[in-house]
Amino acid sequence: MSKENLNIDRINELARKKKEHGLTNEEAKEQTKLRRQYLEEFRKGFKQQIENTKVIDPEGNDVTPEKLKKIQEEKHNK
């Protein structure tokens, strides 16, 4: 199992425990930390995916937003 899956499993485990019994201070801090890490990784992956996307209309024209084209160009020139 990947580290990400283990983190999701632990986040879910802590969420269930919070609903059923509540969390200790340490568990609440762990939950916050794991959620923050998960969101950070999710956002990073999503940003990479968007930055590598090209939008083509039904006629085959590149209609990628200019802002995205500029970001892609800057990354390509590095």
From Swiss-Prot:
Tell whether Nucleotidyltransferase is among the UniProt keywords.
no
Keywords for this entry? Cytoplasm
User: Where is this protein localized, as stated in its record?
Assistant: Cytoplasm
What InterPro entries does the database record attribute to this sequence? DUF896 (IPR009242)
The ranges of region (Disordered) come to 53-78
Main subcellular location: cytoplasm
Q: Which domain of life is it from?
A: Bacteria
Compositionally biased spans, kind Basic and acidic residues: 64-78
Question: According to its record, what are the GO cellular component terms?
Answer: cytoplasm
SUPFAM superfamilies to which the protein is assigned, alphabetical: YnzC-like
The residue range of the signal peptide is none
| Record PANTHER family | UPF0291 PROTEIN CBO2609/CLC_2481, UPF0291 PROTEIN YNZC
Q: What is stated as this protein's family in its record?
A: Belongs to the UPF0291 family.
Q: What is this protein called?
A: UPF0291 protein SERP0911
Q: Which organism is it from?
A: Staphylococcus epidermidis (strain ATCC 35984 / DSM 28319 / BCRC 17069 / CCUG 31568 / BM 3577 / RP62A)
